[in-house]
């Protein structure tokens, strides 16, 4: 806990989010912008709000987020992971519910590297019999 802020770091793909929460009225600010301005897709907004709605804290915390790296979906996932960790820092009794929903576990899937001699990570050149 930093002052009256609770902190959580979230990661997803190559995105990293630093999340600070404190008691408030439900404002979420991402990189200095309101969340609805920062994330253009409705699914991204839904992903970010999932841990708050699960724990019935959607209107009880003001959230400040610094997120960098990755794309929109990766950043939304990183913010969700960071909010989850910050909520656990605030109240450890929320951990079982968040864990059962799968929000505590860091999604370890990363982009597979491209291999030499292939078009992509696994896509080979088209094979011709003749």
Swiss-Prot record:
GO terms for cellular component: cytosolic small ribosomal subunit. Gene3D superfamilies: 3.30.230.10. The keyword Cell membrane does not apply. Keywords: Ribonucleoprotein, Ribosomal protein. GO terms for molecular function: RNA binding; structural constituent of ribosome. One of its GO terms (biological process) is translation. Belongs to the universal ribosomal protein uS9 family. This is Small ribosomal subunit protein uS9. The gene is rpsI.
């Amino acid at each position: 806990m930093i002052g009256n802020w609770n902190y959580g770091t979230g990661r997803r793909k190559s995105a990293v989010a630093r999340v600070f929460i404190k008691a408030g009225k439900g404002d979420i600010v991402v990189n200095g912008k309101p969340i609805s301005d920062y994330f253009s897709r409705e699914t991204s907004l839904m992903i970010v709000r999932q841990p708050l709605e699960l724990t019935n804290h959607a209107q009880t915390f003001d959230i400040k987020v610094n997120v960098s790296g990755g794309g929109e979906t990766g950043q939304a996932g990183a913010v969700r992971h960071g909010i989850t960790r910050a909520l656990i820092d605030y109240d450890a009794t929320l951990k079982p519910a968040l864990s059962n929903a799968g929000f505590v576990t860091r999604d370890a899937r990363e982009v597979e590297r491209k291999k030499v001699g292939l078009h992509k990570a696994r896509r080979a050149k088209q094979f011709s019999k003749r």
